[in-house]
Amino acid sequence: MTQDELKQQVAIAAIEYVVPDTFIGVGTGSTANFFIDELAKIKGKIKGAVASSEATAERLKDHGIPVMELNSVDELSVYIDGADEADPKLNLIKGGGGALTREKIVLAVAKQFVCIADDSKKVAVLGKFPLPIEVIPMARSYVAREVVKRFGGEPVLREGFTTDNGNVILDIHGLEITDPVAMETELNGIVGVVTNGLFAARNADIFLCGTANGVETIKA
């Protein structure tokens, strides 16, 4: 199966986790896009969706799915999103698409987090995929120095990219993240960091993993 076929497979499987007559959170990226296309087929069953990026909001609207502002919603029944890496405890690296901050905010309001990805995203230890950090532009160089001092790795500015919040992304290459919860917390304590792409303090509850033999359901 192609990677796109695996993504579509998990997108279809994720529909089972959509709770009727509730608001749901929708992530950003290629796998999330497959989910949005599937969600469109049952759009009458939900009250609406909260998007984690402008791109996701546009795709939802194109399908006629009601898009809500997060500030007008008290609770989301589920948040469904992809990942760039997932370890055995369902700690994740996300943010390859640059929407990590809004993804974390939307997730914070959700009762359940269902991660959807193909099996190429499964890893024993996080860090082979560069870890994104959203940074206030004037703090870019300072944050890069602090990251190297504390964790090693090689920070690279994501050229020509600005987040939906008007900030920049540093991608940290060459990490081996053995304690993702501690690292997530410490990174977020560096002045100038908005947030980082570790989803460990709040990890996935369920990982729907697309394989050549079908969808594997992994629970945290």
UniProtKB/Swiss-Prot annotation:
It comes from the Bacteria. CDD domains: RPI_A. The keyword Secreted does not apply. The keyword Aminoacyl-tRNA synthetase does not apply. The active site is at 103 (proton acceptor). One of its GO terms (cellular component) is cytosol. Pathway: Carbohydrate degradation; pentose phosphate pathway; D-ribose 5-phosphate from D-ribulose 5-phosphate (non-oxidative stage): step 1/1. InterPro entries: NagB/RpiA_transferase-like, Ribose5P_isomerase_typA_subgr, Ribose5P_isomerase_type_A. Belongs to the ribose 5-phosphate isomerase family. This is Ribose-5-phosphate isomerase A. The lineage of its organism: Bacteria, Pseudomonadati, Pseudomonadota, Gammaproteobacteria, Thiotrichales.
